[in-house]
Amino acid sequence: MSDQSNSRLIYGFHAVLAKLRHDPEGIFEIYTDAQRNDARARDLLRHAEQLGARVIPSEGERLDKMVGTRRHQGVVARVDSRRKELKLPDVLDGLTEPALLLVLDGIQDPHNLGACLRVADAAGAHAVIAPKDKAVGLNATAVKVASGAADTVPYITVTNLARALREMQEAGVWVLGAAGEAERSIYTVDQKGPTAWVLGAEGDGLRRLTRETCDELVRIPMYGTVESLNVSVASGLCLFEARRQRSMA
């Protein structure tokens, strides 16, 4: 029986399969909808069996109650919540290419956090950094939306975001803050060297101290009538522009 006090729930095929592939030892048990026998369910069960994970066939209603939603796709896993506390130097010291980091300032919506993790994975970002307080944590909803990226992208939480940004600067990382009123655009600022993109919550933007700590504020050009983008969309534009520039270097 797993230690409930040291566990959290993740759900959805992408999230559970990613956990099986990257950290099978961190899985206590997997609950599956006993009525599902399609190819995706069989594939997950095969992976679980190969890795020796404990599988508990369950009623769909039980899964609904466990996670508080019916959008679990018939698979829920109880995993070890005692993740190794990664520090920024742990990531930076092991890099063989210029750093590409995503920093989230005060994101409150778990859907946005999950989407940002997914974008960071797709763009090959080396870590996502966020404050421990006044921001959403890595809960089951964020993990599901991340579609497995929560177990592939290092997620680092810090007690003082401004201090963390200064640590990045001391390590040679150029810290760029996304701000709509900035003069330079993401297409004119050089991102070929070690770069950290800092994005704030949709609507509120970057906090004052965060803005003041950034090396430079940069805007995403807007050509239509809307004034802002969802933070995950903005993250994708910034990170992939960095990748585009680096591919041309």
What are these model-derived regions, one by one?
Residues M1-V91:
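N-terminal positively charged helical leader segments and presequences
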Residues L17, D121-A122, V143-A149, R208-A249:
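Structured adenosyl-cofactor binding patch, chiefly the S-adenosyl-L-methionine
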Residues M66-D80, A146-A149, P154-V158, Q191-G200:
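Short basic, glycine-rich beta-strand/loop surfaces that mediate nucleic-acid
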Residues Q35-R36, E61, D133-A135, E202-D204, ...:
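Short, acidic/turn-prone active-site loops that include or flank metal/cofactor-
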Residues L176-S232:
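Active-site/ligand-binding-proximal alpha/beta "capping" segment
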Residues E61-M66, R83-E85, L161-L165, R184, ...:
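A short acidic, often aromatic-flanked loop/helix-cap motif at beta-alpha or helix-coil junctions
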Residues A18, H22-E25, T32, R36, ...:
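RNA substrate-binding interface of SAM-dependent RNA methyltransferases
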